[in-house]
Amino acid sequence: MKAKILLLVSIFFLSVTIPQAIAQGLTGRAYYKSSSQIKIAMDSTKMAPEQMAEIQAQLKKQMERDYILSFTQTESNWKQAESLGGGPATASSGGMTMVINTGSQDKILYKNLADQSFLREEEVMGKEFLIKDTLEPSEWELTSETKKIGNYTAQKATYSRIVDSQRFSTGMTEMENVKDTIRVTAWFTPEIPVSHGPDNFFGLPGLILEVQNQGRILICEKIELNPSTNPVKIEQPKKGKVVNREEFRAMQEAGMKQMMNQYQGKPGEGNQFTIRIGN
């Protein structure tokens, strides 16, 4: 009986320590593709439905992006991959030009899970900022649903929360304060035992391979684990004036108000406005 107990204890010890030992030395790169569904509601007297459909189709195509997540056990970098089409998504029809800024190629998001901190390079009205603050963990709910993503078995997790946000009124004449419910679905694989994920997402018991968030889909297409020819190096962003999360949100709000004023423009000139949706 004592021998059986010792054997069970030994098996349990190995089952716990071996994955931990593997994870402690684990590094890698995950390559993601981003796509977005664009839905923009405007006053029908300002733009015909055909014009809006044309703009939305142009933006959807241009907003496809490639990203790279580099990671160790506790740190990660998230940045856009180099490409010829890495600038803002731009569409125009009938004198209206719309620009959606999805983040510059050289902007970096750094996350440190050990001390629950992050650094993120951002830009508002041509000025560079470095957001430095604590990570906001999500209350993930794990499900039993699984599917294959590439060679990995992924498990489904979800969360939702209510946030305060601002958006343009239908006529694009003023800003409205609204309550939005954010619903996120993620698929993670315990086969890669790190709690990292694309963009702002993290905190699951395995690498997040896919995220569905408000019309945006991020999906992992390739993974390199412990690469020997090009070892993983985690870079901390340094460019820009250091601000916290709330200070940056206030600057974004001011930028949105300025954008609204620019949109109103002079009659007959045509209008251009920019929407920023994050990195």
Where are these regions (language model features)?
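Bacterial Sec-dependent N-terminal signal peptides
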Residues: M1-Y32
